[in-house]
From Swiss-Prot:
Tissue: Predominantly expressed in petal limbs and tubes of corollas.
Residues the record lists as binding benzoate: Q25, W157, Q260
Keywords: Magnesium, Metal-binding, Methyltransferase, S-adenosyl-L-methionine, Transferase
Pathway the protein acts in: Aromatic compound metabolism
An example molecular function term from Gene Ontology annotations: metal ion binding
A GO BP annotation: methylation
Protein name stated in the entry: S-adenosyl-L-methionine:benzoic acid/salicylic acid carboxyl methyltransferase 2
EC numbers for this chain: 2.1.1.273, 2.1.1.274
Family to which the UniProt record says this protein belongs: Belongs to the methyltransferase superfamily. Type-7 methyltransferase family.
Species per Swiss-Prot/TrEMBL record: Petunia hybrida (Petunia)
């Protein structure tokens, strides 16, 4: 499985689309706004650029993408008015892997711009937008061309499934029953990927440029702790139930692994300091409930829909597409039972960085 070819959120605007099932991600963007705001204020008030070049890496599609744009424009507009400056030109780069539904994203752009003008007037901008398909573990932009990089709920995804994890049988991710060699392989791949990410962004950002990165993570130093692995363990349970029913072959489940690593703040700090291109301004964690909806009665349904929007393309690349409704029905039942018995939360790691040279 080539991750770059199959990793993307469900496109379009249907029942299983990411656009209609990304409330958790929206809440996280709103929760991290104070950190984003401070980073952008510090950047703008130190450089006062006439053109502000911003990249959203792992932008996906839907309202959340435009929520980020709206936040950043409003922050800059408020700050430039304090100094009596003319509004800068804004140049937003939307980056994601080639399978992302860029068509749906850009079809929504006109309505978003009109709505933004209604809220903050005509005096800002102009705004320019471009789509940049490709892996953010490679170079994406010209040298020293960016002022600000933003990424939310993307950097936990790996560039590939780690090598040497063939013995992770019965699991689809790191789990309490995973051999130590599997845990080490996942961390090794994460360290390689995140180091490359920092290296390439340091080449693309100008001196003093900022990054605000939010990713799924954990507070525990145990990479198999429930706070980061449990959601995937429950999906593995759903798949294994279909194995028991003879609908999926056991070896198919054994051969499937999620290309993701959810780091601790200490791991993020270690890799940033080891790579050496950035200083850490803030490094924090936050929590958000699996069920971001206020509708508690349908918690299992809401969470399974959210996870389907995220994971279905990966699953379809390996399993029969016709089984997806059944897989996520089983998953919903398992999640509902789990949520009735215990507290279920995602842990977010947020880091604000400044490029040194």
């Amino acid at each position: 499985m080539e991750v770059v070819e199959v990793l993307h959120m469900n496109g379009g605007n249907g029942d299983s689309s990411y656009a209609n099932n990304s409330l958790v991600q929206q809440k996280v963007i709103l929760m991290t706004k104070p950190i984003t705001e401070q980073a952008m204020i510090d950047l703008y008030s130190s450089l006062f650029p006439e053109t502000l070049c911003i990249a959203d890496l792992g932008c996906s599609l839907g309202a959340n993408t435009f929520l980020v744009v709206s936040q950043l424009v409003k922050i800059v507009e408020k700050e430039r008015k304090k100094h009596g400056f003319k509004s800068p030109e804004f140049y937003f780069h939307f980056n994601d892997l080639p399978g992302n539904d860029f068509n749906t994203l850009f079809q929504s752009l006109g309505a978003f711009q009109e709505d933004l003008r209604k809220h903050i007037g005509e005096s800002f901008g102009p705004c320019f937008f471009s789509g940049v398909p490709g892996s953010f573990y490679t170079r994406l932009f010209p040298s020293k061309s960016l002022h600000f990089v933003y990424s939310s709920y993307s950097l936990m995804w790996l560039s590939q499934v780690p090598n040497g994890i063939e013995n992770n049988k019965g699991n689809i991710y790191m789990a309490r029953t995973s051999p130590l060699s599997v845990i080490k392989a996942y961390y090794k791949q994460y360290e390689i990927d995140f180091s490359n990410f920092l290296k390439y962004r340091s080449e693309e950002l100008m001196k003093g440029g900022k990054m605000v990165l939010t990713l799924l993570g954990r507070e525990s130093e145990d990479p198999t702790s429930k706070e980061c692995c449990y959601i995937w363990e429950l999906l593995a349970m759903a798949l294994n139930k279909l194995v028991e029913e003879g609908l999926i072959k056991e070896e198919k489940v054994d051969a499937f692994n999620i290309p993701q690593y959810t780091p601790s703040p200490a791991e993020v700090k270690y890799i940033v300091e080891k790579e050496g291109s950035f200083t850490i301004n803030r490094l924090e964690t936050s929590r958000v409930h699996w069920n971001a909806s206020n509708n508690e009665k349908n918690g299992g349904y809401n969470v399974s829909r959210c996870m389907r929007a995220v994971a279905e393309p990966l699953l379809v690349s390996h399993f029969d597409k016709e089984l997806m409704d059944l897989v996520f029905h089983k998953y919903e039942e398992i999640i509902s039972d789990c949520m009735s018995k215990e507290k279920t939360e995602f842990i977010n790691v947020i880091v604000s960085l400044t490029k040194i040279n």
